[in-house]
From Swiss-Prot:
Lineage: Bacteria, Pseudomonadati, Pseudomonadota, Gammaproteobacteria, Legionellales
Enzyme Commission identifier(s): 4.3.2.10, 3.5.1.2
Gene name as annotated: hisH2
Protein name stated in the entry: Imidazole glycerol phosphate synthase subunit HisH 2
Organism for this UniProt entry: Legionella pneumophila (strain Paris)
GO MF, one annotated term: glutaminase activity
Keywords on record: Amino-acid biosynthesis, Cytoplasm, Glutamine amidotransferase, Histidine biosynthesis, Hydrolase, Lyase
Amino acid sequence: MIAVIDVSGNNLTSLTNALIRLGGHFALTHDAEEIQKASHVILPGVGTARSGMTALQQNGLIDVLRTLTQPLLGICLGMQLLLEYSEEDDIPCLGLIPGVAELLKAERNHPVPHMGWNNLHWQKTSSLQQGLNNSDYVYFVHSYALKADDYALARCQYHEEFTAVVKKGNFYGMQFHPEKSADVGMVLLNNFLSLESTC
């Protein structure tokens, strides 16, 4: 079973529809026991870092997520919450992946938020990349990002380079929305769900 963490009342229709298309058995949940028993966990996120961390804390999920051994995927804000810190609201995050979510620099031809299609540049071989090309496009909507570093599986260029896909151990993050990224996004989600689980 796939646990989709639902603590903020966000509209998760696009994500759940994608999982239905993939034939995944999932539950929208904020129940700690259900999350711990899941084969895969997805942490979506829309809003601010403070609201996201507050929602996780109010539902008693911070320590739960920190101790998971199965694959965990953070999407958009969910990826940023996996980091050590966010400049948005100056708030500590889960600390599962080293790094800080920093505000993107706005330029004349690169407004913030970064919104729309942009391509991935894979840096490391990963099972997430199976069936994909180095020039595939995915859909972004964000103002904060992790600078490209050693944990980046894929990077993206938007005036400056940032991490688009990140991995440390069983923790994965995608700064873009795979559920809104057409066929490429479906391949990425399917590849994540195909990762071996310890549960």
